[in-house]
Amino acid sequence: MADDHTHVQDFFAPRAADWDSRFPDDGPAFAVAVGELGLSPGDAVLDAGCGTGRALPALRGAVGPGGTVVGADVTHAMLAAALRAGRESSGTLVLADAARLPLRAGVLDAVFAAGLISHLPHPEQGLGELARVARPGGRLALFHPIGRAALAARHGRTLSDDDLRAEPRLTPLLAGAGWRLESYADEDRRFLALAVRTG
């Protein structure tokens, strides 16, 4: 992948306005994944690569009014779609690169990242940045509302062991970035890897 995010912006910007209508049935899967992140009232959580902010209402529900929810995305058009959908009421929206976040070290209890890892130009560096902003013992959810095989089929590809989300690749990638993989689910209707911040 390129070192910049032009390819990500070029892909998502023209699709932002109708992104939610293209995948209208994903909402419950987001809510279930957020539920498995183990958030508590008052926690601080980041939705990294938040897109149109589909996870923000569930994240706000989990941390309550005393918690902090931040949604960061590198594509302005996706954040604009989140605003049109009224999701800024669930969290603060920030135009930011997930690999260079405008957050202090160790300020988050958890990070939620739906579909993000395959869009990071340097995945270990990007996951390391997510670890930097998470406290020791903080949690990470790498999520997609469909599993690897279904996603590969959607894009006209065959499933490959080279996929970053394949467990044999993901486990050492996370470890090198400061995370320990705790659970891994790759099913037809979802992908969810949960990790804990080490150190």
Where are these regions (language model features)?
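Conserved class I S-adenosyl-L-methionine
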Residues: M1-P41, R54-A58, M78-A81, R148-R157, ...
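Class I SAM-dependent methyltransferase SAM/SAH-binding core
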Residues: L46-A48, T52-R100
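Helix-to-beta-strand junctions that scaffold the AdoMet/dcAdoMet cofactor pocket
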Residues: G64, L120-P121, A134-R135
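A short acidic, Gly/Pro-enriched loop at the edge of an enzyme's catalytic core
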Residues: A99-A110
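A short SAM/SAH-binding and catalytic strip from SAM-dependent methyltransferases
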Residues: A110-H122
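A short glycine-rich, Lys/Arg-flanked "PGG" loop and its adjoining helix->strand segment in the class I
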Residues: E124-P136
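Conserved beta-strand signature within the Rossmann-like core of class I S-adenosyl-L-methionine
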Residues: G138-H144
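Short alpha-helix
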Residues: D162-A177
